[in-house]
């Protein structure tokens, strides 16, 4: 028998191992019906009248088999691809056993092969049991010495289960993420936890998967509900409505062909001939390969016919084999049947395996081969023996082919479009892509051969040149010029990275960009902007999780996987038994993966810095040090009236970082050489988001749990070196973290100190409020993270058995365990806001002459405040605000503002005191606000101690009514600690939290832009968009295409509504304003 070019003819003569060619089998398993309906070359020959194998073409009234159309695969049927063609057989009689197997297979696909649990309950992707190891898993296992390349090898070593012989009808094809985790933790050799692997058995009538047992179930009182995992039959299509009458008549006819049940619990079954027709359609697929018994020229007895026909397909026997129960089958049909439905005889259901099949007696074979068949060709009508029937039909086919060639040479019809009738021939451009490929198949082959021979295989250039010549010949010169420009690399379209930069910097959501892309393409006729899928491809290289890297030594308690994107903020938190689930929604990047992406974003700047310093590129592969500024701040309530999700408080907390500098310790140099320094350390463009969480910053327990994994990753990175490819060479980096971008409230939260109203006023020294008011300038920085930890242990254990007040005085205000190390410094932005708040209150008191009055009433204070607001609005154009913000503070702390206030102060002496106080403050302010005070304001730095001493004298004398025994937190830090911090760190302003506060404003805008119903997806969108917004790579494209961005913003309304004043101003909460 010749080999037929069709996927279903690949079944071997004997039953082979079920997974001998797993990839080929899997391809056949997931065939789409449109693929199966496609006319293959072998089938096209059959349509023209030729037989491949032992099949001959039939006249109009006859068919060679029960050919109704190309049927589907039985495995497709079992895997849920059910349709009217493959569920219902001839006469639409349903094969109940195949439906039952379909349900059973659906249950198996929902379970884990190794633990038996439901796949939907295990968070994470599912993995193929017979698949190959992915790159991440293989690299992780290679590091621990496992050289396995496929999952069956790993499963055999870890779970002691051989899955190489699994069958699709018995074993689940997937295993869950939990079992994957166990395999990875065991290094591919062993399992550290006991996993009971269930023993999978074939499907039976009383299968526990299809009909699970329930001990509380009473069958006689309540009807059992269908199982949850079972799939329902497909809905009836509109084609089924035409045969309603036939279906009703068929149901009535079934009663005549079904044998009555033999017992009270037995179900009736369909007649054997109908069952065989269904097997042909769904299992054997031999309609065009085996001969029908209707080709017999004589009217033979029924018993004789049953002896020469196959008990599976009802066709004449082809390569007959005999079972132990003396039933006869075609060799290929019984092999497919046993593989699909199990090793038993189709006729009597007795056990029958592939090894039990034998060849029938020679006498029977002689009778079978001598059967007379009638040739189905109309012009022939001869009676041909069965053994010579194939040669006879092949001769007819060769004659027809020769005749076609002669007629084609003698006529001009060969040059006309081929149309065999039916629908009129459509134009090439109106066809589907698949039909276009089919029509141009020969031309494509010729062009490919020419390109390989003449142009080195560049088929694209050949096709574009042909198109260009066709346009020139048709005088389409404008379109030809555009095509030629595109071929030369100077096309009209923008680069995908440019389009991504425009989308991010103009705050366009994906849907808004897609509408703009379609509008521009439709109106201009050119594809200036790139489609969304190209932008998503460009995004992948810029987001964390794209670049490979390595830590030496490996980070403790951190996964070695490099390709990790946005994860749950609580992942990595080791929960104890007593912990309750966190009432929060949080999303973050893994800290080390985010740092790698940020460094790759600075790759060009780092290489340029090496060249500017005259350092040899290949020699600088180690000794890199990276300084990181960390910032964290709560944003207050940003809740809206719409949106779904868990009822968590909508008080976001943002944790971000900024790469401040990159330096290298070159060989032979005493000091490190700085090759990159962030030019705008307080810009929102350089402050990269790491974590977003909906949590109240006052909730110490939840905040500790959310930031705990970040702290663990941060501490692990301090003791390891990062190996990363920069500039084509692997280089090692060490990271130094400085937590400086925190306000007073957040510092006290992280360091375990009492709240801002505590007696212990300062987070830098141990002074009380009374001590700080008596001695305003002579203090030094004494607190540290390690000291706070030691004091917490004293507070927790009380080793000296002291009273509460004595113990509190000993630990200096430490009341909780510090969980994140912060740098003992002063935040410049919040210092400005806190001092401006204090000056605002001084102005009120001076207007009301509080130095004369003991206890003014609340109404009097309100009137003074109203007068001050009115004067500032009139003279300074300053609108009153509910809470002090950065913009208001900058305008209030000026000489113009104090002059406006002096107009409301009656005493000349008090006016001069106010002017002197503001003048001293204006001279002191640049020292803590400038990025590098030694270079930018050296004179103010030298006079700072004198000015602060004079400032303190004014407060303790002229304004003694307000500062007698008390002083604010930020005024104390301003007067006492600024010179020491500047001498130690070189700057205060560069390490401020202003970039993170500006990012809070961006958060509100991104949230409006990406308003999805789920808070989880909303945080992911905001985090991803904000990261892209801070990309140096995209900022360079934005600088080069400013005009494109301005034109886009002028033509498209990106937000749809004006920004509120709350978003326009940087709103920062300060208590008691």
Curated annotation (Swiss-Prot):
A zinc finger (RAG1-type) spans 371-400. Its EC number is 3.1.-.-, 2.3.2.27. GO terms for cellular component: DNA recombinase complex; endodeoxyribonuclease complex; nucleus. A divalent metal cation binds at residues 633, 743, 997. InterPro entries: RAG1 (IPR024627), RAG1_imp-bd (IPR035714), RAG1_Znf (IPR019485), RAG_nonamer-bd_dom (IPR023336), Znf_C3HC4_RING-type (IPR018957), Znf_RING (IPR001841), Znf_RING/FYVE/PHD (IPR013083), Znf_RING_CS (IPR017907). It is found in: Nucleus. This is V(D)J recombination-activating protein 1. It comes from Oncorhynchus mykiss (Rainbow trout).
């Amino acid at each position: 028998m010749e080999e037929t070019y069709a996927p279903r003819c690949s079944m071997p003569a004997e039953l082979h191992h079920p997974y001998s060619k797993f990839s080929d089998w899997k391809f056949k398993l997931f065939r789409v019906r449109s693929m199966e309906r496609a006319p293959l070359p072998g089938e096209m020959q059959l349509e023209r009248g030729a037989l491949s194998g032992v099949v001959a073409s039939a006249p109009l009234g006859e068919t060679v088999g029960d050919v109704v159309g190309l049927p589907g695969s039985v495995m497709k049927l079992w895997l849920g691809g059910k349709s009217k063609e493959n569920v219902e057989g001839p006469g639409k009689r349903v094969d109940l056993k195949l439906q039952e197997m379909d349900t059973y297979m659906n249950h198996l696909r929902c379970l884990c092969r190794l633990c038996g649990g439901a796949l939907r309950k295990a968070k994470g992707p599912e993995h193929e049991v017979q698949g190959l190891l992915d790159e991440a898993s293989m690299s992780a296992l290679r590091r621990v010495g496992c050289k396995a390349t496929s999952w069956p090898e790993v499963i055999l070593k870890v779970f002691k289960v051989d899955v190489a012989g699994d069958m699709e009808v018995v074993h689940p094809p997937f295993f869950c993420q939990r079992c994957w985790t166990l395999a990875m933790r065991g290094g591919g050799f062993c399992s550290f936890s006991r996993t009971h692997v269930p023993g999978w058995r074939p499907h039976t009538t009383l299968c526990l998967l299809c009909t699970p047992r329930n001990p509380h179930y009473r069958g006689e009182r309540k009807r059992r509900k269908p199982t949850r995992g079972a799939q329902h039959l497909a809905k009836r299509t509109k084609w089924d409505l035409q045969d309603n009458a036939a279906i009703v008549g068929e149901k009535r006819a079934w009663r005549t062909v079904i044998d009555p049940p033999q017992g009270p619990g037995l179900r009736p079954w369909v007649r054997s001939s109908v069952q065989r027709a269904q097997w042909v359609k769904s299992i054997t697929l031999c309609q065009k390969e085996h001969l029908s018994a209707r080709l017999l020229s004589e009217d033979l007895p029924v018993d004789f016919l049953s002896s020469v026909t196959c008990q599976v397909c009802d066709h004449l026997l082809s390569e007959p084999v005999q079972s132990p129960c003396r039933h006869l089958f075609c060799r290929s049909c019984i092999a497919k049947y046993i593989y699909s439905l199990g090793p038993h005889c189709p006729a009597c259901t007795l056990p029958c395996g592939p090894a039990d099949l034998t060849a029938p007696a020679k006498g029977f074979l002689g009778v079978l081969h001598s059967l007379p068949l009638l040739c189905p060709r109309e012009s022939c009508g001869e009676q041909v023996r069965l053994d010579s029937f194939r040669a006879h039909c092949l001769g007819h086919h060769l004659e027809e082919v020769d005749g076609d060639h002669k007629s084609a040479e003698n006529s001009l019809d060969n040059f006309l479009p081929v149309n065999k009738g039916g629908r009129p021939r459509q134009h090439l451009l109106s066809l589907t892509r698949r039909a276009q490929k089919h029509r141009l198949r020969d031309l494509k082959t010729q062009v490919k051969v020419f390109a390989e021979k003449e142009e080195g295989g560049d088929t694209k250039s050949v096709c574009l040149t042909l198109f260009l010549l066709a346009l020139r010949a048709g005088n389409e010169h404008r379109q030809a010029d555009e095509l030629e420009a595109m071929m030369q690399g100077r096309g009209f379209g923008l680069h995908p990275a440019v389009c991504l930069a425009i989308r991010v910097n103009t705050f366009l959501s994906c849907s808004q960009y897609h509408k703009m892309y379609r509008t521009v393409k439709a109106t201009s006729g050119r594809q200036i902007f790139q489609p969304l899928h190209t932008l998503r491809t460009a995004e992948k290289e810029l987001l964390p999780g794209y670049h490979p890297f390595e830590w030496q030594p490996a980070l403790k308690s951190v996964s070695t996987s490099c390709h990790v994107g946005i994860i749950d903020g609580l992942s990595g938190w080791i929960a104890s038994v007593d912990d309750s689930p966190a009432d929060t929604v949080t999303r973050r990047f893994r800290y080390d993966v985010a740092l790698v992406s940020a460094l790759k974003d600075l790759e060009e700047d780092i290489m340029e810095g090496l060249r500017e310093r005259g350092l040899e590129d290949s020699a600088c592969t180690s000794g890199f040090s990276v300084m990181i500024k960390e910032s964290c701040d709560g944003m207050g309530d940003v809740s809206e009236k719409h949106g779904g999700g868990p009822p968590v408080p909508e008080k976001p907390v943002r944790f971000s970082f900024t790469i401040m500098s990159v330096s290298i310790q070159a060989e032979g140099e005493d000091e490190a050489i700085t090759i990159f320094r962030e030019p705008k350390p307080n810009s929102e463009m350089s402050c990269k988001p790491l974590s977003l969480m909906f949590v109240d910053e006052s909730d110490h327990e939840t905040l500790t749990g959310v930031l705990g994994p970040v702290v663990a990753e941060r501490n692990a990175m301090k003791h390891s070196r990062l190996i990363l490819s920069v500039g084509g060479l692997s280089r090692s980096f060490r990271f130094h973290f400085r937590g400086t971008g925190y306000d007073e409230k957040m510092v006290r939260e992280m360091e375990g100190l009492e709240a801002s109203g505590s007696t212990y006023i300062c987070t830098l020294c141990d002074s009380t409020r009374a001590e700080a008011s008596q001695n305003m300038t002579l203090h030094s920085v004494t607190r540290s993270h390690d000291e706070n930890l030691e004091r917490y242990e004293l507070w927790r254990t009380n080793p000296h058995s002291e009273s509460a007040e004595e113990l509190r005085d000993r630990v200096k205000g430490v009341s909780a365990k510090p969980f994140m190390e912060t740098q003992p410094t002063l935040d410049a932005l919040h210092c400005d806001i806190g001092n401006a708040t204090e000056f605002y209150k001084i102005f009120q008191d001076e207007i009301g002459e509080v130095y004369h009055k003991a206890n003014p009433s609340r109404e009097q204070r309100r009137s003074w405040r109203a007068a001050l607001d009115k004067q500032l609005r009139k003279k300074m154009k300053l609108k009153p605000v509910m809470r002090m913000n950065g913009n208001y503070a900058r305008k209030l702390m000026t000489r113009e503002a104090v002059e406006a206030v002096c107009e409301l102060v009656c005493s000349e002496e008090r006016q001069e005191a106010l002017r002197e106080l503001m003048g001293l403050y204006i001279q002191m302010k640049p020292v803590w606000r400038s990025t590098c005070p030694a270079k930018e304001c050296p004179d103010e730095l030298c006079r700072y101690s004198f000015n602060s001493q004079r400032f303190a004298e004014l407060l303790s004398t002229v304004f003694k009514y307000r500062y007698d025994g008390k002083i604010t937190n930020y005024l104390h830090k301003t007067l006492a600690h600024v010179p020491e911090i500047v001498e130690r760190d070189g700057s205060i302003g560069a390490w401020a939290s202003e970039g993170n506060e500006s990012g809070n404003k961006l958060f509100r805008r991104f949230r409006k832009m990406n308003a999805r119903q789920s808070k989880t997806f909303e945080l992911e969108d905001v985090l991803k968009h904000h990261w892209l917004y801070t990309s140096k790579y995209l900022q360079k494209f934005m600088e080069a295409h400013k005009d494109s961005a301005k034109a886009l913003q002028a033509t498209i309304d990106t937000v749809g509504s004006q920004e509120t004043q709350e978003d326009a101003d940087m709103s920062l909460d300060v208590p008691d304003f």
